[in-house]
């Protein structure tokens, strides 16, 4: 496996410059992972396949789905790509490299765990700020246009929000100056995670069923509580008020600061 990865990476660094890999390569990888992981949920919603796992009974119209895709392509090309290009000198200054040797899996794993933790913390507070009345009305309400979210709506947002919350995603890598392959793996995992959180389905194989604190189970000495993709779906069904699930990946921040109380009460009522 290592030799396969090394061979593939050798081909990339031989045929492309650092700038091309870090900017154009990252953009192509992001678009590929994002749409390949998100488009299947449009198929599920349109066909009704696996509808017993759908969180809401309502579905989006093909027109609404098409609008989302068109806006995403526009913003990805006009906001995301320029942002990647503009941030390249910063990452290079902080130590990012693409040359050999490749980092060990221990280093990669430790860095990505750090990125998830710091991204979740920064995203939580940034997301709460976006739910203040003025910012919600003028910026964040764009993301909440889809009260019935599907995978691709995870990145459907106002350009200002893309820049604002995008900081949470890049702050970890900017601090550590990782190898580009680590940055790519982090980006892939983060994209898959946010698509899953907005997918509108909760399957038996959903990660939240198996990974503690990952939008899943919060187990304490005195209680346990099961979260799921339904937690963020609940967030989209409500207005800018305290609707919870401000975190991006984990659930402990919502629990610590009490922003999961409304969801927990709703779950308790449904179970009685």
From Swiss-Prot:
Cite the Pfam families for this sequence: FA_hydroxylase
Primary residence:
endoplasmic reticulum
One GO MF annotation is:
C-4 methylsterol oxidase activity
Question: Its membrane topology, per UniProt?
Answer: Multi-pass membrane protein
What residue stretches are annotated with the Fatty acid hydroxylase domain?
113-259
GO biological process, alphabetically ordered: 4-alpha-methyl-delta7-sterol oxidation; sterol biosynthetic process
Q: Could you tell me which cysteines form disulfide bridges?
A: none
Entry's transmembrane regions: 24-44, 72-94, 107-127, 162-182, 209-229
Q: Which domain of life is it from?
A: Eukaryota
Q: Which cofactor does it need?
A: Fe cation
Q: Where on this chain is Histidine box-1 (motif)? A: 127-131
What's said on domains?
The histidine box domains may contain the active site and/or be involved in metal ion binding.
Purpose of the protein: Together with SMO2-2, required during embryogenesis, probably by maintaining sterols and auxin homeostasis.
User: What family is this?
Assistant: Belongs to the sterol desaturase family.
Recorded protein name is Methylsterol monooxygenase 2-1
């Amino acid at each position: 496996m290592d030799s396969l990865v090394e061979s593939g990476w050798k081909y990339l660094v031989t045929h492309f410059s650092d700038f091309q890999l870090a900017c154009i390569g990252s953009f192509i990888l992001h678009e590929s992972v994002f749409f390949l992981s998100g488009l299947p949920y449009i198929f599920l919603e349109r066909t009704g396949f696996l509808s017993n796992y759908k969180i809401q009974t309502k579905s989006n119209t093909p027109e609404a789905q098409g609008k989302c895709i068109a806006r995403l392509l526009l913003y990805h090309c006009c906001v995301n790509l320029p942002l990647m290009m503009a941030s390249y000198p910063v990452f290079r200054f902080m130590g990012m490299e693409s040359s050999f040797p490749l980092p060990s899996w221990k280093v990669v794993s430790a860095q990505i765990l750090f990125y998830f933790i710091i991204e979740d913390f920064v995203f939580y507070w940034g997301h709460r700020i976006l739910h203040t009345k003025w910012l919600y009305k003028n910026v964040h309400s764009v993301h909440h246009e889809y009260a019935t979210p599907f995978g691709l709506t995870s990145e459907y947002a106002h350009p200002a929000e893309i820049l604002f919350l995008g900081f949470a995603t890049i702050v970890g890598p900017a601090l550590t100056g990782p190898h580009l392959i680590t940055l790519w793996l982090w980006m892939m995992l983060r994209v898959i995670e946010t698509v899953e959180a907005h997918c509108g389905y909760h399957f038996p194989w959903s990660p939240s069923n198996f990974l503690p604190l990952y939008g899943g189970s919060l187990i304490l000495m005195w209680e346990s509580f099961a979260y799921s993709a339904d937690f963020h779906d609940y967030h989209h069904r409500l207005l800018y008020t305290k609707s919870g699930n401000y975190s991006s990946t984990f659930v402990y921040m919502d629990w610590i600061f009490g922003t999961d109380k409304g969801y927990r009460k709703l779950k308790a009522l449904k179970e009685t």
